[in-house]
Swiss-Prot record:
Gene: pmi
Alphabetized InterPro entries for the sequence: 6-hairpin_glycosidase_sf, 6hp_glycosidase-like_sf, AGE/CE, AGE_dom
GO biological process: carbohydrate metabolic process
Organism: Rhizobium meliloti (strain 1021) (Ensifer meliloti)
Enzyme Commission number: 5.3.1.8
Name of the featured protein: Mannose-6-phosphate isomerase
Family per record: Belongs to the N-acylglucosamine 2-epimerase family.
């Protein structure tokens, strides 16, 4: 199996560098109006769908990361232009970013979402890495946004409120993306490493103490104000894609901090995701479970396949012998699942949703997924080099 994964990694890297990055640079970046499009249709043409705020910093991340990895296309215009558009269109007087604009760059929903702010932080860190001349600016912007978030919606126990005034349920997912932004920021030259490391530690412990159920080891999505599971069905929701994504993040954190507990928690998250979160017939990760691990939504979306791959390959890099072989086999299954979603007529696009019967939903390719795919391909390359 070990050899297969090297072949899959090569195929995925070729797809990314030769097809996806050129296509999303040429058709996915709006050279006239600025910014990134929300979707590209299956013929390879951009749509005029409304543009979610999160898509802009996610695509900035993609092109900044591609530039850092030596992709020879024009990543810089897209990365810098995308941030400029994000600031101009979504930026609010208070320093936060709104939620939704139309294709003409008019903001149509200015509401605050912690999730969107987390991606701004991720973009700042990656731009600082690849454009050192903008490092000081990114440090300043990053610090300012972190302090504003702490002032606006710091939770009295740990983590963050959804907004000010507080609203329920509280969510684990915005914290996951903040955690990711912290782990990126604490590594960047010039960034306030102590502040970012402290926030990363706080979120890691909140996840291990509250988000993850002490008995089952699964991670919930929705919580009451005291970080107890939210009442009713909503509090029972478990997303296998997020189990893998949290496992991957906790492994990264555990390796930096030497924290054995986080590895134990991550291993259990992975186990549930692989055993209960994948459909045996289609060998794909499904969308939603309940907290008894029964399937709530058998739809399979593309992004959880990438998180399965990231977690499996990082576990493989951290283990050895038979255990490593098991994780490599799992990574091979995840890569195969991902490749089925990438198998479309126009190379460089993807399907987003597979129905329970195995057929794919006919719809344009969402730009928001690129961040998941690109990150997984780079993680696969990096972890294979460590073995």
């Amino acid at each position: 199996m070990g050899m297969d994964i090297h072949l899959q990694a090569g195929e995925l890297a070729g797809w990314l560098n030769d097809a996806a990055l050129p296509l999303w640079r040429q058709k996915g970046f709006d050279g006239e109006g600025g910014g990134f499009v929300e979707t590209i249709d299956m013929k390879g043409e951009p749509t005029r769908d409304d543009r979610r705020s999160r898509v802009q910093p996610r695509q900035v991340y993609c092109f900044a990361a591609a530039g850092r990895r030596g992709w020879d296309g024009d990543w810089r215009t897209a990365a810098e232009g995308g941030l400029l558009y994000f600031d101009r269109v979504y930026g609010q007087p208070g320093g936060f970013y709104g939620a939704l604009a139309n294709a003409d760059g008019k903001l149509i929903d200015a509401s605050f979402d912690l999730y969107n702010q987390a991606f701004a932080l991720l973009a700042f860190a990656h731009l600082a890495e690849v454009l050192p001349e903008r490092g000081a600016e990114m440090v300043g912007r990053s610090d300012k946004l972190r302090r504003q978030l702490e002032a606006r919606c710091k939770h009295p126990l740990a983590g963050f409120e959804e907004d000010d005034p507080p609203r329920l349920p509280l969510g684990s997912n915005p914290h996951m993306h903040l955690f990711e932004a912290c782990l990126a920021s604490e590594e960047v030259e010039g960034f306030d490493r102590v502040a970012w490391a402290n926030l990363a530690d706080e979120i890691a412990h909140l996840a291990m103490d509250r988000f993850i159920d002490a008995e089952s080891g699964a991670l919930r999505e929705f919580f009451d104000h005291d970080w107890a599971p939210f009442p009713g069905e909503k509090g029972r929701i478990v997303e296998p894609g997020h189990l893998f994504e949290w496992a991957w993040l906790l492994l990264r954190w555990a390796e930096r901090r030497g924290n054995a507990q986080a590895i134990v928690k991550a291993r259990r998250l992975f186990e549930i995701g692989e055993k209960d979160g994948t459909c045996p017939d289609r060998d794909v990760v499904v969308m939603t479970l309940f907290d008894d691990f029964s399937v709530a939504d058998p739809t399979a979306r593309l992004w959880p396949q990438t998180e399965w791959l990231k977690a499996a390959i990082r576990f493989a890099a951290l283990t050895e012998g038979a255990e490593r072989e098991r994780y490599l086999a799992s990574a091979g299954r995840a890569a195969a699942a991902l490749q089925r979603f990438l198998n479309v007529p126009v190379r460089g696009l993807w399907r987003d949703k597979q129905k329970a019967d195995g057929s794919f939903v006919e719809e344009p390719a969402p730009a928001s997924t690129f961040y998941h795919i690109l990150c997984a391909i780079y993680e696969l390359e990096d972890c294979l080099k460590r073995m």
